[in-house]
């Protein structure tokens, strides 16, 4: 079922992947990504833990209506969260690449 090397080889791969996962999680936690809305009029920077680090609002929006500004802030945050999720997914793909997992094996994360 596991081919030459058997379960020992699979366990070694799992340990290597666990080490790579820990490294990737540390990298992502330190990562900062900026989301935008309104063609860059509102920018929100969040870290890998989805904590807001910075909010930038173009001064021209301060005179507009409050509801529109709130919508732009929410959209910018959602854009930043989407970008973090994409980055996490890309980094996860690099962690699991090269592993010889059995067909149908699902990752636990």
UniProtKB/Swiss-Prot annotation:
SUPFAM superfamilies xrefs: YbaB-like (SSF82607)
InterPro entries: YbaB-like_sf, YbaB/EbfC
Superkingdom of origin organism: Bacteria
Keywords: Cytoplasm, DNA-binding
GO molecular function, one term: DNA binding
Entry's transmembrane regions: none
Location relative to the cell: Cytoplasm, Nucleoid
PANTHER family associated with the record: NUCLEOID-ASSOCIATED PROTEIN YBAB
Complex formation: Homodimer.
Family: Belongs to the YbaB/EbfC family.
Record's protein name: Nucleoid-associated protein ECA1177
Classification lineage: Bacteria, Pseudomonadati, Pseudomonadota, Gammaproteobacteria, Enterobacterales
């Amino acid at each position: 079922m596991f081919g030459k090397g058997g379960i020992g080889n699979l366990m070694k791969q799992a340990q290597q992947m666990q080490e790579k996962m820990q490294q990737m999680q540390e990298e992502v936690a330190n990562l900062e990504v900026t989301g935008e809305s309104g063609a860059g009029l509102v920018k929100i920077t969040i870290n890998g833990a989805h904590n807001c680090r910075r909010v930038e609002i173009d001064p021209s929006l301060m005179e507009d209506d409050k509801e529109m500004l709130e919508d732009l802030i929410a959209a910018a945050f959602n854009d930043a969260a989407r970008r973090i999720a994409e980055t996490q997914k890309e980094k996860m793909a690099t962690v699991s690449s090269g592993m010889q997992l059995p067909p149908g094996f699902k990752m636990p994360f």
